[in-house]
C-alpha cells in the first residue's frame, strides 16, 4: 500500500500565499496495480540520481485524446501505461466509482463532456504544449536537493487535467501536476471561483515551488498534525519553504516563519537540511 496526499485548490493557494492559514489534506490509501504488461518503460524513481534528466510524463495528452475524441487507444494507454494515475483520477479525484466497474470509462467520458471542462482541456493543452522549461527546472532543483539530502527519493512527475479541485497530488513515488490549476492569474474562468489572492498563485511559475514544497512536506511530515498547535504547523511549513527558497536560489517564500528559520540557520551553519526538517523542536526558532 502507499499513501497519496491530495492538496486541494484552497489548501495549495492559501499555503503559498499566507503561512498562517491551514492546509487541508486528505490522505487516501491506494492499492498497487500490476504493471507487468506496460507498452513502454516509464522512468523509475531515482532516475535523476544517475544523472538523467527529469521529464514530466504527459498523461494529460492521453486524457485529452480520449476525453475530446473518444479515442479508445488513448484510453488503453491510460489504463496500461498509467494504472495508478488512472485509478487515482477516477476513484479519488473525480470520485466516479471503482476503476474496474464495466461502465466507468463511459462515465468518465460523459463527465468530461461538460463545456467548462472541455474548455479547460483545450486551454491546458495549448498552454502546456511544451514543458521543457519545467523539466529543466525540476532536474536542476532535484540535483541540488540530492546534494543536501542524499537519501531523498526522486519521484516520477506526471501532468494531468482534473476538475479545478486539486493542484498537486503527492505519493511516495510520484507527483501529479494538475495543469488546469496553472493557467495564469488572468485566466477568465478563475475569476468566477477564486479570489485575486488565490489566482496570483495559479501560474506556470508556481508549478516548481508547489512541487518542491508539497513533495518535501510528504517526505518530512509534521508529527501529530491534528494535535499540534498552529504555531508548530507554521514553523514546520516555514522550514519547508526556507529549503525551497534555497533550492530556487531566491526568496520565493517570505514571512515571519521563513525569516525565523533563516536566522536560526545562520546561527547553526553546521546543521544539515535533513536535521532541520527532521527536528520537531520548534522552540529553537524563538529569539
How does the language model describe each region?
Residues 38-106:
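N-terminal mature-domain "stem" immediately C-terminal to a signal peptide or N-terminal signal-anchor/transmembrane
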Residues 13-15:
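Intrinsic-disorder-associated, low-complexity terminal segments enriched in Asp/Asn/His/Tyr and depleted
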Residues 33-36:
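C-terminal motif of bacterial Sec signal peptides marking the signal peptidase cleavage site
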Residues 3-10:
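Hydrophobic alpha-helical signal peptides and transmembrane signal-/tail-anchor segments
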Residues 107-278, 284-287:
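Acidic/His-rich structured neighborhood in mature extracellular/periplasmic domains
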Residues 2, 21-27:
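Sec-dependent signal peptide recognition
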Amino acid at each position: 500500500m502507499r499513501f497519496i496526499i491530495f492538496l486541494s485548490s484552497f489548501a495549495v493557494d492559501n499555503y503559498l500565499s499566507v503561512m498562517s492559514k491551514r492546509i487541508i489534506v486528505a490522505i487516501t490509501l491506494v492499492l498497487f496495480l500490476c504493471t507487468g504488461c506496460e507498452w513502454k518503460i516509464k522512468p523509475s524513481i531515482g532516475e535523476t540520481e544517475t544523472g538523467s534528466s527529469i521529464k514530466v510524463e504527459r498523461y494529460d495528452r492521453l486524457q485529452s485524446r480520449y476525453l475530446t475524441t473518444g479515442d479508445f487507444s488513448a484510453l488503453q494507454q491510460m489504463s496500461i501505461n498509467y494504472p495508478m494515475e488512472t485509478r487515482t483520477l477516477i476513484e479519488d479525484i473525480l470520485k466516479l466509482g471503482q476503476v474496474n466497474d464495466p461502465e466507468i470509462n463511459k462515465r468518465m467520458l460523459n463527465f468530461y463532456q461538460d463545456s467548462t471542462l472541455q474548455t479547460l482541456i483545450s486551454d491546458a493543452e495549448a498552454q502546456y504544449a511544451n514543458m521543457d522549461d519545467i523539466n529543466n527546472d525540476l532536474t536542476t532543483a532535484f540535483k541540488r536537493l540530492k546534494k543536501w539530502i542524499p537519501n531523498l527519493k526522486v519521484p516520477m512527475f506526471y501532468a494531468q487535467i482534473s476538475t479545478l479541485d486539486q493542484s498537486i497530488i503527492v505519493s511516495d513515488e510520484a507527483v501529479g501536476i494538475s495543469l488546469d490549476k496553472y493557467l495564469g492569474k488572468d485566466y477568465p474562468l478563475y475569476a468566477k471561483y477564486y479570489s485575486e489572492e488565490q489566482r496570483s498563485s495559479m501560474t506556470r511559475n508556481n508549478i516548481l515551488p508547489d512541487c518542491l514544497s508539497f513533495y518535501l512536506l510528504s517526505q518530512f511530515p509534521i508529527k501529530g498534525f491534528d494535535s499540534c498547535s498552529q504555531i508548530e504547523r507554521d514553523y514546520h511549513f516555514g522550514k519547508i519553504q526556507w529549503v525551497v527558497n534555497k533550492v530556487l536560489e531566491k526568496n520565493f517564500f517570505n514571512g515571519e516563519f521563513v525569516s525565523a528559520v533563516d536566522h536560526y540557520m545562520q546561527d547553526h551553519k553546521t546543521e544539515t537540511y535533513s536535521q532541520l526538517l527532521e527536528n520537531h523542536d520548534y522552540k529553537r526558532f524563538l529569539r
